[in-house]
């Protein structure tokens, strides 16, 4: 099945890419979630125009991503308060949503929770941690934050 991606899909492509996938994957996952549209001649021509506009925007976005990277790497005071037992063990774990909220409180910048590369179960105790934030293709910022007991 030939599809045109409308969203960034891991291990498949970026918006505007024309990909060949198995019919079930396309019909049951990509199309219902709006990650892709069926590739037709008209859609392919439309995508070419969109890609040209995206390339122009990408140059501006790259400069912006570099600025944000510098800002995030120099950011201090990112603190996440969590409930803990008397032994210091957390109830649950810190999620990407918690990190996004903490960054927003620290400097007012909103991040996409999907851009934070946090493996499930990584942060389960108090302490200082670091995560990678994918800002742009090839630009990854390292963000440090502290998890404290509330």
Curated annotation (Swiss-Prot):
Top-level taxon: Bacteria
MF terms from GO for this chain are:
rRNA binding; structural constituent of ribosome
| Role of this protein | Binds to the 23S rRNA.
Q: Which UniProt keywords apply?
A: Ribonucleoprotein, Ribosomal protein, RNA-binding, rRNA-binding
Keyword Ribonucleoprotein in record: yes
Stated name of the protein: Large ribosomal subunit protein bL9
Q: What is the lineage of its organism?
A: Bacteria, Bacillati, Actinomycetota, Actinomycetes, Mycobacteriales
Q: Which protein family is it in?
A: Belongs to the bacterial ribosomal protein bL9 family.
What is the native source organism of this protein? Corynebacterium jeikeium (strain K411)
């Amino acid at each position: 099945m030939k599809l045109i991606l409308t969203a960034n899909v891991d291990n498949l492509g970026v918006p505007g890419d024309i990909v060949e996938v198995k019919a079930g994957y396309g019909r049951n996952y990509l199309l219902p979630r709006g990650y892709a549209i069926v590739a037709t001649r008209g859609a392919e021509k439309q995508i070419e125009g969109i890609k040209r506009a995206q390339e122009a925007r990408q140059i501006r976005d790259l400069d912006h991503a570099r600025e944000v990277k510098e800002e995030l790497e120099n950011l201090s005071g990112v603190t996440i308060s969590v409930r803990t037992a008397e032994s210091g063990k957390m109830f649950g774990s810190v999620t990407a949503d918690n990190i996004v909220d903490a960054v927003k409180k620290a400097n007012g910048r909103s991040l996409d929770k999907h851009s934070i590369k946090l493996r499930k179960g990584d942060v389960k105790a108090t302490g200082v941690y670091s995560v990678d934030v994918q800002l742009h293709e090839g630009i990854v910022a390292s963000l440090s934050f502290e998890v404290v007991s509330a």
